[in-house]
Protein backbone atom coordinates (compact mmCIF):
# COMPACT_ATOMS: atom_id res chain seq x y z
CA UNK A 1 0.00 0.00 0.00
CA UNK A 2 1.36 3.40 -0.94
CA UNK A 3 1.51 6.13 1.66
CA UNK A 4 -0.19 9.45 0.89
CA UNK A 5 2.07 11.76 -1.05
CA UNK A 6 1.73 15.45 -1.90
CA UNK A 7 0.01 16.44 -5.09
CA UNK A 8 1.91 17.39 -8.20
CA UNK A 9 1.49 21.12 -7.51
CA UNK A 10 3.30 20.80 -4.16
CA UNK A 11 6.24 18.76 -5.41
CA UNK A 12 9.66 20.40 -5.76
CA UNK A 13 10.71 21.81 -9.08
CA UNK A 14 13.08 18.95 -9.76
CA UNK A 15 10.22 16.44 -9.46
CA UNK A 16 7.77 18.11 -11.84
CA UNK A 17 7.85 17.38 -15.54
CA UNK A 18 11.15 15.46 -15.57
CA UNK A 19 11.12 11.95 -16.99
CA UNK A 20 7.48 11.30 -16.18
CA UNK A 21 5.40 8.52 -17.62
CA UNK A 22 3.36 9.37 -20.66
CA UNK A 23 -0.30 9.98 -20.06
CA UNK A 24 -2.43 6.97 -20.88
CA UNK A 25 -5.31 7.65 -23.28
CA UNK A 26 -8.38 5.47 -22.71
CA UNK A 27 -10.56 4.33 -25.55
CA UNK A 28 -14.37 4.44 -25.20
CA UNK A 29 -14.62 0.66 -24.85
CA UNK A 30 -11.96 0.62 -22.10
CA UNK A 31 -13.73 3.45 -20.24
CA UNK A 32 -17.09 1.63 -20.42
CA UNK A 33 -15.57 -1.60 -19.05
CA UNK A 34 -13.86 0.25 -16.21
CA UNK A 35 -17.03 2.17 -15.27
CA UNK A 36 -19.14 -0.97 -15.30
CA UNK A 37 -16.70 -2.66 -12.93
CA UNK A 38 -16.63 0.46 -10.75
CA UNK A 39 -20.43 0.44 -10.43
CA UNK A 40 -20.30 -3.12 -9.16
CA UNK A 41 -17.41 -2.53 -6.70
CA UNK A 42 -15.41 0.69 -6.27
CA UNK A 43 -12.73 -1.29 -4.40
CA UNK A 44 -11.85 -4.26 -6.62
CA UNK A 45 -9.30 -6.76 -5.44
CA UNK A 46 -6.11 -7.81 -7.13
CA UNK A 47 -7.78 -10.75 -8.92
CA UNK A 48 -10.56 -8.56 -10.37
CA UNK A 49 -8.09 -5.95 -11.53
CA UNK A 50 -5.90 -8.53 -13.22
CA UNK A 51 -8.86 -10.01 -15.13
CA UNK A 52 -10.01 -6.53 -16.14
CA UNK A 53 -6.50 -5.57 -17.23
CA UNK A 54 -6.22 -8.70 -19.37
CA UNK A 55 -9.63 -8.01 -20.92
CA UNK A 56 -8.96 -4.42 -21.99
CA UNK A 57 -5.23 -4.82 -22.64
CA UNK A 58 -3.99 -2.37 -19.99
CA UNK A 59 -1.36 -3.12 -17.30
CA UNK A 60 -2.83 -3.86 -13.90
CA UNK A 61 -1.02 -0.95 -12.12
CA UNK A 62 -2.70 1.50 -14.55
CA UNK A 63 -6.08 -0.06 -13.76
CA UNK A 64 -5.40 0.36 -10.04
CA UNK A 65 -4.50 4.04 -10.56
CA UNK A 66 -7.70 4.55 -12.56
CA UNK A 67 -9.82 3.18 -9.71
CA UNK A 68 -8.03 5.39 -7.20
CA UNK A 69 -8.64 8.50 -9.30
CA UNK A 70 -12.27 7.60 -9.94
CA UNK A 71 -12.93 7.10 -6.22
CA UNK A 72 -11.44 10.53 -5.52
CA UNK A 73 -13.64 12.17 -8.17
CA UNK A 74 -16.79 10.47 -6.89
CA UNK A 75 -15.98 11.38 -3.30
CA UNK A 76 -15.52 15.06 -4.17
CA UNK A 77 -18.79 15.07 -6.10
CA UNK A 78 -20.68 13.50 -3.20
CA UNK A 79 -19.25 16.10 -0.82
CA UNK A 80 -20.30 18.97 -3.08
CA UNK A 81 -23.83 17.55 -3.34
CA UNK A 82 -23.94 16.70 0.40
CA UNK A 83 -24.62 13.05 -0.34
CA UNK A 84 -23.19 10.21 1.74
CA UNK A 85 -20.43 8.14 0.20
CA UNK A 86 -21.65 4.53 -0.19
CA UNK A 87 -18.20 3.09 0.45
CA UNK A 88 -17.43 -0.58 -0.09
CA UNK A 89 -20.08 -2.81 -1.59
CA UNK A 90 -20.22 -6.51 -1.06
CA UNK A 91 -17.63 -8.63 0.66
CA UNK A 92 -14.04 -7.31 0.59
CA UNK A 93 -11.91 -8.92 -2.06
CA UNK A 94 -8.39 -10.15 -1.67
CA UNK A 95 -5.58 -7.59 -1.66
CA UNK A 96 -2.25 -7.79 -3.39
CA UNK A 97 0.36 -9.75 -1.56
CA UNK A 98 3.02 -7.72 0.15
CA UNK A 99 6.11 -7.44 -2.01
CA UNK A 100 9.15 -8.85 -0.24
CA UNK A 101 12.27 -6.74 -0.81
CA UNK A 102 15.61 -8.39 -0.04
CA UNK A 103 18.62 -6.70 1.50
CA UNK A 104 20.51 -6.37 -1.79
CA UNK A 105 17.43 -4.85 -3.47
CA UNK A 106 17.01 -2.42 -0.57
CA UNK A 107 20.66 -1.38 -0.83
CA UNK A 108 20.26 -0.59 -4.54
CA UNK A 109 17.08 1.37 -3.88
CA UNK A 110 18.68 3.33 -1.02
CA UNK A 111 21.67 4.31 -3.16
CA UNK A 112 19.30 5.50 -5.88
CA UNK A 113 17.22 7.38 -3.32
CA UNK A 114 20.29 9.21 -1.99
CA UNK A 115 21.14 10.33 -5.50
CA UNK A 116 17.63 11.31 -6.55
CA UNK A 117 14.48 11.34 -4.45
CA UNK A 118 12.26 11.74 -7.52
CA UNK A 119 13.51 9.31 -10.18
CA UNK A 120 11.92 9.41 -13.59
CA UNK A 121 10.36 6.58 -15.50
CA UNK A 122 13.66 5.67 -17.17
CA UNK A 123 15.51 5.45 -13.84
CA UNK A 124 12.73 3.37 -12.31
CA UNK A 125 12.74 0.96 -15.24
CA UNK A 126 16.53 0.61 -14.93
CA UNK A 127 16.13 -0.16 -11.22
CA UNK A 128 13.43 -2.65 -12.08
CA UNK A 129 15.84 -4.49 -14.37
CA UNK A 130 18.60 -4.44 -11.73
CA UNK A 131 16.45 -5.54 -8.80
CA UNK A 132 13.95 -7.75 -10.61
CA UNK A 133 11.00 -5.89 -9.06
CA UNK A 134 8.09 -4.49 -11.06
CA UNK A 135 8.44 -0.84 -11.97
CA UNK A 136 5.11 -0.05 -10.29
CA UNK A 137 6.41 -1.50 -6.99
CA UNK A 138 9.57 0.59 -7.25
CA UNK A 139 7.48 3.70 -7.75
CA UNK A 140 5.45 2.84 -4.64
CA UNK A 141 8.66 2.19 -2.69
CA UNK A 142 9.98 5.68 -3.55
CA UNK A 143 6.65 7.25 -2.57
CA UNK A 144 6.69 5.49 0.78
CA UNK A 145 10.33 6.37 1.35
CA UNK A 146 9.72 10.07 0.67
CA UNK A 147 6.74 10.05 3.04
CA UNK A 148 8.62 8.32 5.86
CA UNK A 149 11.90 10.27 5.48
CA UNK A 150 11.17 13.74 4.10
CA UNK A 151 14.57 15.10 5.13
CA UNK A 152 16.75 12.46 3.50
CA UNK A 153 18.04 12.06 0.00
CA UNK A 154 20.65 14.81 -0.09
CA UNK A 155 18.10 17.58 0.23
CA UNK A 156 19.36 20.24 2.64
CA UNK A 157 16.76 21.64 5.05
CA UNK A 158 15.80 25.26 4.65
CA UNK A 159 17.75 27.56 6.92
CA UNK A 160 15.60 29.92 8.93
CA UNK A 161 16.76 33.49 8.98
CA UNK A 162 15.63 36.53 10.89
CA UNK A 163 16.23 40.20 11.28
CA UNK A 164 18.90 39.60 13.89
CA UNK A 165 20.47 36.36 12.63
CA UNK A 166 23.79 38.03 12.11
CA UNK A 167 25.40 41.24 13.21
CA UNK A 168 28.00 43.23 11.27
CA UNK A 169 31.53 42.66 12.36
CA UNK A 170 30.74 39.48 14.20
CA UNK A 171 29.10 41.34 17.08
CA UNK A 172 25.92 40.51 18.87
CA UNK A 173 22.63 41.73 17.42
CA UNK A 174 20.73 44.48 19.13
CA UNK A 175 18.44 43.31 21.94
CA UNK A 176 14.69 43.45 21.70
CA UNK A 177 14.32 46.27 24.20
CA UNK A 178 16.36 48.76 22.17
CA UNK A 179 13.94 51.40 20.88
CA UNK A 180 14.49 54.73 19.24
CA UNK A 181 12.73 58.00 20.03
CA UNK A 182 11.09 60.42 17.66
CA UNK A 183 10.91 64.07 18.65
CA UNK A 184 8.04 66.30 17.71
CA UNK A 185 7.59 70.08 17.84
CA UNK A 186 8.05 70.22 21.62
CA UNK A 187 10.57 67.43 21.68
CA UNK A 188 8.23 64.84 23.12
CA UNK A 189 9.88 61.45 22.78
CA UNK A 190 7.77 58.82 21.08
CA UNK A 191 9.14 55.27 21.22
CA UNK A 192 9.54 53.70 17.82
CA UNK A 193 8.82 50.04 17.11
CA UNK A 194 11.70 47.95 18.31
CA UNK A 195 13.53 45.41 16.25
CA UNK A 196 12.51 41.82 17.08
CA UNK A 197 15.75 40.29 18.24
CA UNK A 198 16.80 37.84 20.86
CA UNK A 199 16.89 39.50 24.28
CA UNK A 200 20.15 39.56 26.15
CA UNK A 201 22.24 39.51 23.01
CA UNK A 202 24.20 42.59 24.00
CA UNK A 203 26.47 42.50 27.04
CA UNK A 204 25.05 44.08 30.17
CA UNK A 205 26.05 47.69 30.55
CA UNK A 206 26.06 48.73 26.92
CA UNK A 207 22.50 49.60 26.04
CA UNK A 208 22.81 52.05 23.19
CA UNK A 209 25.10 51.63 20.22
CA UNK A 210 25.71 54.08 17.44
CA UNK A 211 21.96 54.62 17.18
CA UNK A 212 22.01 56.38 20.59
CA UNK A 213 22.45 59.67 18.81
CA UNK A 214 19.07 59.11 17.15
CA UNK A 215 17.26 58.65 20.49
CA UNK A 216 18.24 61.66 22.64
CA UNK A 217 16.45 63.21 25.57
CA UNK A 218 15.81 66.94 25.41
CA UNK A 219 17.22 69.60 27.66
CA UNK A 220 17.34 73.41 27.45
CA UNK A 221 20.39 74.87 25.86
CA UNK A 222 20.99 77.05 28.92
CA UNK A 223 21.71 74.01 31.08
CA UNK A 224 25.18 72.60 31.28
CA UNK A 225 25.78 69.35 29.41
CA UNK A 226 25.88 66.12 31.32
CA UNK A 227 29.20 65.10 32.73
CA UNK A 228 31.20 63.04 30.28
CA UNK A 229 28.98 63.94 27.27
CA UNK A 230 29.98 66.70 24.91
CA UNK A 231 27.15 68.11 22.82
CA UNK A 232 27.42 70.76 20.11
CA UNK A 233 25.46 73.97 20.51
CA UNK A 234 22.22 73.97 18.49
CA UNK A 235 21.74 76.49 15.75
CA UNK A 236 18.71 78.29 17.21
CA UNK A 237 19.47 77.74 20.88
CA UNK A 238 16.11 76.12 21.61
CA UNK A 239 17.10 72.65 22.71
CA UNK A 240 20.18 70.57 23.18
CA UNK A 241 20.39 66.82 23.20
CA UNK A 242 21.71 64.35 25.72
CA UNK A 243 21.22 60.61 26.20
CA UNK A 244 20.93 59.54 29.86
CA UNK A 245 21.82 55.96 30.73
CA UNK A 246 19.62 54.12 33.27
CA UNK A 247 21.03 51.32 35.41
CA UNK A 248 21.12 47.67 34.39
CA UNK A 249 21.36 48.63 30.75
CA UNK A 250 17.66 49.42 30.28
CA UNK A 251 16.41 52.32 28.22
CA UNK A 252 14.31 54.94 29.95
CA UNK A 253 11.59 57.13 28.58
CA UNK A 254 12.81 60.45 27.23
CA UNK A 255 12.27 63.43 29.46
CA UNK A 256 9.23 65.63 29.05
CA UNK A 257 9.74 69.11 27.57
CA UNK A 258 10.67 71.98 29.85
CA UNK A 259 8.86 75.27 30.12
CA UNK A 260 10.11 77.35 27.18
CA UNK A 261 11.67 80.72 27.99
CA UNK A 262 9.47 83.76 27.66
CA UNK A 263 9.65 85.09 24.10
CA UNK A 264 9.90 88.68 25.33
CA UNK A 265 13.07 88.08 27.28
CA UNK A 266 16.48 88.04 25.80
CA UNK A 267 19.05 85.37 26.53
CA UNK A 268 20.82 87.58 29.06
CA UNK A 269 17.62 88.52 30.99
CA UNK A 270 16.52 84.97 31.65
CA UNK A 271 16.68 83.62 35.17
CA UNK A 272 19.33 80.90 35.27
CA UNK A 273 17.74 79.29 38.33
CA UNK A 274 14.31 78.94 36.76
CA UNK A 275 15.63 77.98 33.34
CA UNK A 276 17.83 75.30 34.87
CA UNK A 277 14.93 73.79 36.77
CA UNK A 278 13.82 70.41 35.38
CA UNK A 279 10.33 70.11 33.94
CA UNK A 280 7.31 69.00 35.93
CA UNK A 281 7.51 65.44 34.69
CA UNK A 282 11.28 65.08 34.53
CA UNK A 283 11.45 63.27 37.86
CA UNK A 284 13.00 59.93 38.72
CA UNK A 285 15.00 60.12 35.52
CA UNK A 286 18.46 58.56 35.40
CA UNK A 287 21.52 60.69 35.52
CA UNK A 288 24.05 61.19 32.77
CA UNK A 289 26.28 58.26 31.96
CA UNK A 290 29.95 58.17 31.38
CA UNK A 291 31.11 57.91 27.83
CA UNK A 292 32.13 54.50 26.64
CA UNK A 293 35.81 53.66 26.48
CA UNK A 294 35.63 52.73 22.82
CA UNK A 295 34.36 56.16 21.80
CA UNK A 296 31.79 54.64 19.45
CA UNK A 297 28.75 56.21 21.07
CA UNK A 298 28.19 53.31 23.49
CA UNK A 299 26.96 54.55 26.86
CA UNK A 300 27.41 52.57 30.04
CA UNK A 301 25.05 52.85 33.04
CA UNK A 302 26.27 53.82 36.49
CA UNK A 303 28.29 51.14 38.18
CA UNK A 304 26.32 51.32 41.43
CA UNK A 305 22.81 50.02 41.87
CA UNK A 306 21.41 53.36 43.01
CA UNK A 307 22.34 56.72 41.55
CA UNK A 308 21.37 60.23 42.67
CA UNK A 309 18.77 62.12 40.72
CA UNK A 310 20.41 64.71 38.56
CA UNK A 311 18.84 68.01 37.61
CA UNK A 312 20.21 69.08 34.26
CA UNK A 313 23.09 71.47 34.81
CA UNK A 314 22.51 71.78 38.58
CA UNK A 315 24.37 68.80 39.96
CA UNK A 316 22.80 65.95 41.94
CA UNK A 317 19.61 66.91 43.76
CA UNK A 318 18.67 65.80 47.24
CA UNK A 319 16.04 63.06 47.14
CA UNK A 320 12.53 64.20 48.04
CA UNK A 321 13.38 67.93 48.09
CA UNK A 322 11.18 70.38 46.20
CA UNK A 323 12.50 73.54 44.60
CA UNK A 324 11.51 76.63 46.52
CA UNK A 325 12.50 80.08 45.24
CA UNK A 326 13.84 82.40 47.92
CA UNK A 327 12.86 86.03 47.58
CA UNK A 328 15.79 88.39 47.71
CA UNK A 329 18.33 85.61 47.68
CA UNK A 330 21.61 86.34 46.04
CA UNK A 331 22.31 84.47 42.82
CA UNK A 332 24.60 81.47 43.13
CA UNK A 333 28.31 82.02 42.63
CA UNK A 334 29.48 81.75 39.06
CA UNK A 335 32.41 79.45 38.31
CA UNK A 336 35.34 80.91 36.48
CA UNK A 337 35.49 80.04 32.80
CA UNK A 338 38.13 77.43 31.95
CA UNK A 339 39.48 79.47 29.09
CA UNK A 340 39.55 83.19 28.36
CA UNK A 341 38.85 82.58 24.69
CA UNK A 342 35.81 80.38 25.32
CA UNK A 343 32.99 80.26 22.82
CA UNK A 344 29.63 81.97 23.22
CA UNK A 345 28.03 78.77 24.44
CA UNK A 346 30.48 78.46 27.31
CA UNK A 347 29.78 82.07 28.24
CA UNK A 348 26.09 81.33 28.48
CA UNK A 349 26.77 78.47 30.84
CA UNK A 350 28.71 80.56 33.36
CA UNK A 351 25.57 81.41 35.33
CA UNK A 352 25.04 77.77 36.23
CA UNK A 353 26.93 76.36 39.21
CA UNK A 354 29.10 73.34 38.75
CA UNK A 355 27.99 70.09 40.40
CA UNK A 356 29.27 69.67 43.90
CA UNK A 357 31.86 67.00 44.38
CA UNK A 358 30.58 66.17 47.87
CA UNK A 359 27.14 65.16 46.61
CA UNK A 360 28.29 62.83 43.83
CA UNK A 361 28.09 59.77 46.03
CA UNK A 362 25.42 57.27 44.98
CA UNK A 363 22.06 57.68 46.66
CA UNK A 364 18.85 55.65 46.32
CA UNK A 365 16.51 56.49 43.50
CA UNK A 366 13.54 58.66 44.37
CA UNK A 367 10.78 60.53 42.62
CA UNK A 368 9.98 64.20 43.28
CA UNK A 369 6.29 65.16 43.28
CA UNK A 370 5.37 66.73 39.99
CA UNK A 371 2.57 68.78 41.55
CA UNK A 372 4.90 70.62 43.94
CA UNK A 373 7.21 71.74 41.18
CA UNK A 374 4.30 72.91 39.03
CA UNK A 375 2.65 74.77 41.92
CA UNK A 376 5.89 76.48 42.88
CA UNK A 377 6.48 77.52 39.30
CA UNK A 378 2.94 78.85 38.83
CA UNK A 379 3.07 80.72 42.16
CA UNK A 380 6.39 82.42 41.47
CA UNK A 381 6.20 86.24 41.09
CA UNK A 382 8.03 86.16 37.79
CA UNK A 383 5.49 83.80 36.26
CA UNK A 384 2.53 85.81 37.55
CA UNK A 385 4.06 89.00 36.25
CA UNK A 386 4.57 87.48 32.81
CA UNK A 387 1.05 86.01 32.73
CA UNK A 388 -0.69 89.22 33.88
CA UNK A 389 -1.06 90.70 30.34
CA UNK A 390 -2.74 87.49 29.19
CA UNK A 391 -5.28 87.58 32.04
CA UNK A 392 -6.39 91.19 31.47
CA UNK A 393 -9.63 91.51 29.49
CA UNK A 394 -9.68 95.30 29.25
CA UNK A 395 -7.18 97.90 28.26
CA UNK A 396 -5.04 99.23 31.15
CA UNK A 397 -6.38 102.79 30.68
CA UNK A 398 -10.03 101.72 30.80
CA UNK A 399 -9.38 99.52 33.83
CA UNK A 400 -7.81 102.41 35.78
CA UNK A 401 -10.68 104.77 34.87
CA UNK A 402 -13.33 102.30 36.05
CA UNK A 403 -11.48 101.66 39.32
CA UNK A 404 -11.14 105.43 39.96
CA UNK A 405 -14.85 106.05 39.27
CA UNK A 406 -15.86 103.21 41.56
CA UNK A 407 -13.72 104.55 44.38
CA UNK A 408 -15.43 108.03 44.20
CA UNK A 409 -18.99 106.68 44.68
CA UNK A 410 -20.12 106.26 48.31
CA UNK A 411 -21.88 103.03 49.27
CA UNK A 412 -25.70 103.11 49.73
CA UNK A 413 -27.12 103.17 53.22
CA UNK A 414 -29.85 100.79 54.42
CA UNK A 415 -32.60 103.43 54.09
CA UNK A 416 -31.55 104.36 50.57
CA UNK A 417 -31.47 100.69 49.65
CA UNK A 418 -35.06 100.15 50.92
CA UNK A 419 -36.30 103.27 49.11
CA UNK A 420 -34.73 102.01 45.91
CA UNK A 421 -36.49 98.66 46.33
CA UNK A 422 -39.88 100.37 46.83
CA UNK A 423 -39.43 102.43 43.69
CA UNK A 424 -38.66 99.31 41.70
Swiss-Prot record:
It comes from Homo sapiens. Residues 278-302, 319-329 have a biased composition (Low complexity). GO terms for cellular component: cytoplasm; cytosol; Golgi apparatus; nuclear membrane; nucleolus; nucleoplasm; nucleus. The two homeobox domains are arranged in a head-to-head orientation when bound to double-stranded DNA, each domain binding to one of the two DNA strands. Together, the homeobox domains can be considered to bind DNA with the consensus sequence 5'-TAATCTAATCA-3', but due to the head-to-head orientation of the DNA-bound domains, the first homeobox domain binds to the consensus sequence 5'-TAAT-3', and the second homeobox domain binds DNA on the opposite strand, with the consensus sequence 5'-TGAT-3'. Both homeobox domains confer nuclear targeting. The C-terminal region is required for efficient activation of transcription from target promoters. It mediates interaction with EP300 and CREBBP. SMART domains: HOX. One of its GO terms (molecular function) is DNA-binding transcription factor activity, RNA polymerase II-specific. InterPro entries: HD, Homeobox_regulator, Homeodomain-like_sf, HTH_motif. Changing residue 148 to A: Decreased DNA binding affinity. Keywords: Activator, Cytoplasm, Developmental protein, DNA-binding, Homeobox, Nucleus, Repeat, Transcription, Transcription regulation. Pfam families: Homeodomain (PF00046). Changing residue 147 to S: Altered sequence specificity, with increased affinity for the DNA sequence 5'-TAATCTAATTA-3'. This is Double homeobox protein 4. It is linked to Facioscapulohumeral muscular dystrophy 1: A degenerative muscle disease characterized by slowly progressive weakness of the muscles of the face, upper-arm, and shoulder girdle. The onset of symptoms usually occurs in the first or second decade of life. Affected individuals usually present with impairment of upper extremity elevation. This tends to be followed by facial weakness, primarily involving the orbicularis oris and orbicularis oculi muscles. Binds DNA as a monomer. Interacts (via C-terminus) with EP300 and CREBBP. Residues 265-274 have a biased composition (Basic and acidic residues). Isoform 1: Does not seem to be expressed in normal muscle, but is detected in muscle of individuals with FSHD, and also in testis (at protein level). Isoform 1: Does not seem to be expressed in normal muscle, but in muscle of individuals with FSHD, where it may be toxic to cells. Isoform 2: Detected in skeletal muscle, fibroblasts and testis from healthy individuals. The keyword Aminoacyl-tRNA synthetase does not apply. Residues 1-24, 72-102, 218-362, 388-414 are annotated as: Disordered. It comes from the Eukaryota. Residues 19-78, 94-153 bind DNA. Residues 327-424 are annotated as: Required for interaction with EP300 and CREBBP, and for transcriptional activation of target genes. DUX genes are present in 3.3-kilobase elements, a tandem repeat family scattered in the genome found on the short arms of all acrocentric chromosomes as well as on several other chromosomes. Changing residue 95 to A: No effect on DNA binding affinity. Residues 405-424 are annotated as: Important for transcriptional activation of target genes.
Amino acid sequence: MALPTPSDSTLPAEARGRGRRRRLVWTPSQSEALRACFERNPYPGIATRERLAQAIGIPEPRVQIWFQNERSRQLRQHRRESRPWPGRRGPPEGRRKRTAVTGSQTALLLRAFEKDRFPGIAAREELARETGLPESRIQIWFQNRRARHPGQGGRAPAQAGGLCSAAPGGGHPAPSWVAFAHTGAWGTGLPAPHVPCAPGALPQGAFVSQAARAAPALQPSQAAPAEGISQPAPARGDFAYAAPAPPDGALSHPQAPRWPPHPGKSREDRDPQRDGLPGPCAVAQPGPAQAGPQGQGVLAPPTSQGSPWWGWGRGPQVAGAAWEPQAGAAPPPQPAPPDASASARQGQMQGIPAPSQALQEPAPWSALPCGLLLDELLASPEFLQQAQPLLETEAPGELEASEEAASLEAPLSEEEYRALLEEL
